[in-house]
Regions:
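Catalytic core of membrane glycerolipid acyltransferases/transacylases, capturing the structured
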Residues: 239-296
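Juxtamembrane intracellular "pre-TM" segments in multi-pass secondary transporters
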Residues: 3-38
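A single, central transmembrane helix in multi-pass transporters
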Residues: 26-84, 138, 172
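Cytoplasmic membrane-interface "Motif A"-like loop-to-helix N-cap segments
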Residues: 91-107, 188
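A cross-family acyltransferase "interaction/gating" segment
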Residues: 326-391
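Loop-to-transmembrane helix entry/capping segments in MFS-fold secondary transporters
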Residues: 68-69, 151-163
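Helix-to-loop junctions at the C-terminal end of transmembrane segments
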Residues: 84-98, 182-183
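C-terminal ends and interior cores of transmembrane alpha-helices
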Residues: 107-121
């Protein structure tokens, strides 16, 4: 049984012999995602350390700047950028720890590191350092939070200490390599390029694990430019159990509004003809969309049940199509077939409001707002009985929609 931290004895012989080091390293590598996050943070800090170390020499040699105020002022902008990037990262992680933005951060850091040695003006490089800081915040906030979130409480202190240990080892090694390369004549430009390739490794490491979250992050960023989405009832979506989402269908973007606040991927049912559109098919297949057609209806429902039995989230629009009259149309009974199978989870009704009159909606009610952000409301209501009929569900949502 694990001893509490206050009852553990520190033994010097074990420390000198490397027993504690081996034990702690084994602990931080036990969960692969934690280890990947630690490696990513270590690579990031190594890049940052080297860039800050060589920029002074680069500015003197290639920009002919000897006044340290300009050099230090440019690098100080990275610090302001980290603050700004951290605030933005927190905003993008308001529903869950969005590690997808770390991939965006890695992309930005890598591109800037490659770009700096090709620029000959401090007036251009200084704003790039600000952006470097913003992208750094995108990396630091979600990955650091993710390490703490994934770590067992009993070992959190050890894992955080191990995280700092690994990061410092990486930074020391990279500074030693920088000194070594500089000693043998590699100039600052080449070192920038070398750090750019380290950034490529960082991007690849994060892309292996968070590429799907990254794509959803891009969707969310694009949507936020035009829509302000307000959610209600997110507490009705369990973190782990299977969920069957059923609700109205008002626009082509309903799938996006449902997915944004949920870290778990939603398995949508979609018309088979749209599913097989050449440009969309690879994306929809990768997104585990379930194709639906009159002939293959039962097979689609059985596949939905299999996903639910695995604990996934499945979403169905019982209206069968996007509404053309801005009202909730009669619900089809097809989803009732799912109730004839056993699966452990909840049935959660939802209602989407605010897209009427949008270019992505079929109903036009005069509520066009071409110059303003549109406010969209998405409500997840309390779970209902799995045996609920299509008519009962339709009436329930019609009653509850006024609370949204």
């Amino acid at each position: 049984r694990e001893l509490s931290a206050s009852k553990r004895r520190f033994v010097w012989s074990r420390y000198i012999g490397g027993f504690y080091l081996r034990k702690n390293l084994k602990m931080i590598t036990r969960k692969k995602e934690i280890w990947d996050n630690i490696l990513a943070l270590s690579l990031f800090w190594s890049i940052s350390q080297v860039v800050l170390a060589i920029f002074g020499q680069y500015a003197k040699t290639y920009l002919h700047i000897t006044n340290t105020i300009y050099v230090q002022g440019s690098m100080a902008l990275a610090g302001f950028g980290i603050v700004l990037g951290s605030i933005l990262a927190a905003k993008l992680s308001r529903y869950y720890i969005n590690a997808g933005i770390a991939l965006l951060g890695a992309m930005g850091v890598t591109l800037i590191t490659f770009l700096v040695p090709h620029l000959g003006s401090i007036e251009i490089i200084a704003p790039l350092f600000l952006l470097f800081g913003v992208f750094s915040g995108f990396i630091l906030v979600p990955l650091s939070a993710n390490i703490q979130h994934l770590s067992p409480n009993a070992h959190l202190g050890t894992i955080l200490a191990g995280n700092n240990f690994i990061q410092n080892i990486f930074m020391i090694l990279f500074l030693m390599l920088t000194t070594f390369f500089a000693y043998f004549g590699m100039d600052a430009k080449m070192l920038f390029v070398l750090m750019g390739f380290v950034g490529v490794v960082l991007f690849w490491l994060l892309a292996k694990r968070y590429s799907v979250l990254f794509v959803w992050t891009l969707f969310e960023l694009l949507a936020s430019l035009r829509y302000k989405v307000v959610y209600k009832g997110l507490e009705n979506i369990p973190q782990e159990k299977a969920v069957l989402l059923l609700g109205n269908h008002v626009s082509w973007l309903d799938w996006l509004f449902l997915q944004i606040p949920l870290r778990r991927r939603i398995n949508f049912l979609m018309d088979k003809e749209i599913y097989h559109w050449p440009l969309l098919h690879p994306v929809l297949k990768a997104g585990e969309v379930i194709p639906l057609s009159p002939r293959g209806f039962k097979d689609a429902m059985k596949e939905a049940v299999r996903r639910l039995q695995k604990g996934h989230i499945v979403a169905i629009f019982p209206e069968g199509e996007i509404t053309r009259n801005c009202e909730i149309n009669p619900f089809h009974k097809g989803f009732e077939l799912i109730d004839s199978f056993e699966w452990d989870g909840v049935l959660v009704p939802f209602y989407i409001d605010g897209m009427q009159g949008s270019i992505f909606a079929r109903c036009k009610d005069g509520r066009k707002k071409p110059l303003f952000r549109r406010e969209v409301h998405v409500c997840f209501f309390t779970p209902q009985s799995k045996g609920i009929s299509a008519l009962e569900l339709e009436q329930f949502i019609k009653r509850k929609r006024y609370e949204c």
